Amino acid sequence: MKFQELDGVKTLRDFPNSGIKRGDIGTVLASFTKPNEAYEVEFCSETGETKALFAILSKDLEILKINRRFIHP
């Protein structure tokens, strides 16, 4: 698996149906291996409300290059 639960990730492309854009930051909540490697990612607003929650293929995500504890205290 490329990512772990609670990893901070950013999107590598737009997801127009959900309002998520390339570069938006989310949190991995779960991982899947079938039929393809994918991750359930939650995207939150600045006030902490969930904006979107859906599965994304691993090729469309990148790990954040900052300390995990900074994102998930």
Report each predicted region and the residues it spans:
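Basic/aromatic-rich interaction segments and small domains that mediate binding to polyanionic partners
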Residues: 3-67, 71-72
